[in-house]
C-alpha cells in the first residue's frame, strides 16, 4: 500500500471545492436577487416607478415644482453615488487590508502624498460647485417676481385658519380684468388715538407709534374666502396663468404650504417691519384638480388642523366662478355653479365638539 504523504493530501485539498466560495458569480447572483426583490416590493406596494424614483416627493403641478423635484432627486443620486464609493472603500479596506497575525511591518502610509491629497480636495470641491450652481439656478427661478402677474391673491393667516382674497385679475388675452382691493376696510384698521397724557399730548402706541392691535399691514378685498371651524377655505385658481401670492399673518408666524407646489413660505406678521419677503409667484399651474394645503409652522394648539384646499380650474371656469362671487354668491354656491364640489374634498374641518358628541371621522 502506498503511503499517503502530505503532498497527496495537499493536492486533494486543492481539488476539493472550498465551502462558502463562489467568487464573483455568487456576488452577481446576490445582487440580481436583491434587485429582483426591490422591484417586487415596488410592484406589490402599488407604487409607480415615477413615485419610487421621486424618493417621496410629489410630482408637482408647477414648472417651479418640477425644477425643485429634479434638483432634489439629482442631489440624492449624487449623494448616494458618493456614499457608495466611500462605503465601498471603507468595507474593502476593512476586509482585504485588515491586520493579520503574520504582519510584522506597518502598512504603506499615504500621508503627505501631494497628488492624492489634491485629488481628494479637488473632487469634493467640484461636486459641491456643481450642486451649488444648480441650486442657485432653481432658487432664482422659484424666487423670480414678474411685473405683470395675471392673478394676485392675498393670503391672510390667523390662529387657526385662512382668509384668501382676489386683489387683482388681469388676463393677458383681455378676457378678464378685475380690481378687487378694498382700501376702505384697510383704512378702518388704522390705530385709533390712545387718549392724552396729563399734559394734553396725544398718547401713541408702543410699536412705532401704533398700538399692539394695529393691523394696517393686512390687505382686504371685495371677494374673500374665509375659513371657519365648520368649513375648510377653498382657494380657487385658474390653470395656465401666472399667479402672485401676497402673504401676511394677523398674529403669529404661520407657513403656506401646498405639497404639490414643492415650495413652502413662512407667513410673517407685519412682513415689512420684520424684513421678510412676503411675495412669491408661480409661472402657471399645469394640472386641474383639488390639492390640500397646510400650515407648516408650529403656531399653537390647533396647528395640525389649519388646512385649506387649492381648487385649480380652467380659465373659463375661473371667470365664471369669479363673476358668481362678484354677484354676491358664497364660495360654495359659486363652485356649485361651475359644476365643482362646493366644499373641500381633500380634507375636512376639525370638529370642535368633545366627548361622545363628536362623530367619528369616516375613512
From Swiss-Prot:
Residues 1-41 form the signal peptide. Belongs to the cytochrome c oxidase subunit 2 family. This is Cytochrome c oxidase subunit 2. Its cofactor is Cu cation; heme. GO terms for molecular function: copper ion binding; cytochrome-c oxidase activity. Binds a copper A center. Residues 1-23 are annotated as: Disordered. It is an enzyme of class 7 (translocase). Subunits I and II form the functional core of the enzyme complex. Electrons originating in cytochrome c are transferred via heme a and Cu(A) to the binuclear center formed by heme a3 and Cu(B). Keywords: Cell membrane, Copper, Electron transport, Heme, Iron, Membrane, Metal-binding, Respiratory chain, Signal, Translocase, Transmembrane, Transmembrane helix, Transport. Disulfide bonds: none annotated.
